[in-house]
Amino acid sequence: MRLTRALTPAILALPAAHAAASLQDWQSLNTTLDHRLHAVTPLALPCFSIYNNHSHAPNEDACLNIQDHYTNASYRVDQVSAYVFSQSETCSPIPSQQCELDPSDPSNPAAYTNISCNTGSLPAYYIDVQHASDVTAAFHFAAKTNTAISIKNSGHDYNGRSSGPGSLSLRTRTLRSTTYHPSFTPASCKTPTGKAVTLGAGVNFHEVYTFAHENKVTFVGGSGPTVGASGGWVLTGGHGVLSRAYGLGIDRVVEFELVTPDGEHRIANACQNADLFWALRGGGGSTFGVVLSSTHRVEPEAPLSLAYLALPPNASSSTSAAFLDLLVNYTLPWAEDAWGGFGNAAATILATPLLSLPEAKTSMATAIDFVTAHGGTGYVETLSSFYEMYTKYIVPSASAVGSVRFNHNWIIPNSLFATASGQKKLRKHLDWMGSVGLVPGLLETTPYLYSGNGHGRSNNNNSNNSSTSTSTSTSSKNGSVKPYAYGGKETTSSTPAWRNSAAVLIAEVGWAFNATLSEKKALAKTLVEASERVRELAPGSGAYANEAHPWVEDWQDAFWGGNYRRLADLKKKWDPKGLLGCWHCVGSEGEGKKETGTAWRAEVVGGKCLGRLI
């Protein structure tokens, strides 16, 4: 009786199309899982007196605690029903389909007074995955009942792929083991890949950077402290500050442990299940299986040079535009010196593991002169390790979360940076973005110098020097960047555009918790227009699926280029029943798919947020 009372409310909350699984089905699954199946309720529910249009008793103490932590990323990733970007919790086109506080002021009573807290796009139930058998049970349940499965690692997906109304959520954050290998040989392989770390699927960058530092090595990862290192980041590409010299996440991962949709517990690497390994190295999350752990090569801990460039807050628009011009002009020269990081018209932070302090100062001299001449701050310093950069610069710059954010990105080919005419076209596009209220940024995080078996480029053979370059080749100072045999033209499946690019252009839009439908549509249309314009500027390039908006046209080509056909074939091989599906993921074409990540679509029909916002 106790189990029935616990599960029934969530069953009753599901729309008809997601009630194919009976109460008996859910109870049977709960028994299989040793009573570890739990209902999902909205994070902010304790603040509301109405839930799904029925009376509900608020909990003031619980509400105050939620309000205190509502915009904290570390708090959110550890909450079952919280996502870093709140579009994953809502059906954006329908204001009533949400249970949100005001992220600008979580104590604002206007968000929850006399308003119904509705389930939105949250899953129905979740499992805290502890063993491979948990995932096997979930896949068997999904095959029997036609229930959608969503996979939640840290919940950072801009497209809401890790949520889904009525779905069964597999939460992997609880898998947090860490192992350091002085020398690692993948299963069934004969050749070791060198120093490596094996990470449970739930380990995030803050945790792995700390662990790596304790073992005097460097993990090459992303900039979001709470992003999972084994989730969508590495499965889709995975870029970061050190990618210039050491490659993307997909270049560095040497083995995955996962459960495939047939329920089998597998190891995938270059020596066994090699086609699956290829698909996992860029084919996207929530597509080919549920990752339990991943193993990545690491670098020795070593000093790096950091450049900090910031204009004063009162900088004129013309000064900001000139600074953005400088970033465009120096993207290629800085890429030659392995400078990696992020820049926009206000500030830039870059780091390189290849230059000494005097060399770094020479490389950055023009930029430092510019910002200091305009009343800003510019300097270069040596840090003892990437971990010092992470703790000193990345952690303090982490922004508040819990609001709606949609991203646009396009990988800009070297050819646009290499000529004066290309730079002019790009700057004209950046000016247009500013004129419509977007804040363009450049991610200097492509694998520009990474070299391996025919892809990327060695810094002993750079042929794209811009006429604006004042730096010398890193090869004369540091030798060539270490080539890795695990690289190679055919070994990863993300968009090939990564291999011929020096930067990624990004922008984002967001809206308030109480934004009207017309306001949402206007912002979304602006973002879409920006992506269409830059695609015309750089046709044949691609986008990073993790940081793309949900309205990308011809997304198969944009996200995977010529790799898509093989990925689609492998999707049919490894998931013939289509038990895993998500928005704009491999194999998601067609109607009637069990997709996650539909939270921004236009109307709720049969339990799904369907149609188009724009």
UniProtKB/Swiss-Prot annotation:
It holds the Pfam family BBE. Residues 119-301 form the FAD-binding PCMH-type domain. Keywords: FAD, Flavoprotein, Glycoprotein, Oxidoreductase, Signal. Residues 456-480 have a biased composition (Low complexity). One of its GO terms (molecular function) is oxidoreductase activity. Gene3D superfamilies: 3.30.465.10. Its cofactor is FAD. Residues 453-495 are annotated as: Disordered. Pathway: Mycotoxin biosynthesis. It is an enzyme of class 1 (oxidoreductase). Glycans are attached at N30, N53, N72, N114, N314, N329, N461, N465, N478, N514. FAD-linked oxidoreductase; part of the gene cluster that mediates the biosynthesis of the cytotoxic leucine-containing cytochalasans, including aspochalasin C, aspochalasin E, TMC-169, flavichalasine F, aspergillin PZ, aspochalasin M and flavichalasine G. The first step in the pathway is catalyzed by the hybrid PKS-NRPS ffsA that utilizes 8 units of malonyl-CoA to iteratively assemble the octaketide chain before addition of L-leucine by the C-terminal NRPS modules. Because ffsA lacks a designated enoylreductase (ER) domain, the required activity is provided the enoyl reductase fssC. Belongs to the oxygen-dependent FAD-linked oxidoreductase family. This is FAD-linked oxidoreductase ffsJ. It comes from Aspergillus flavipes.
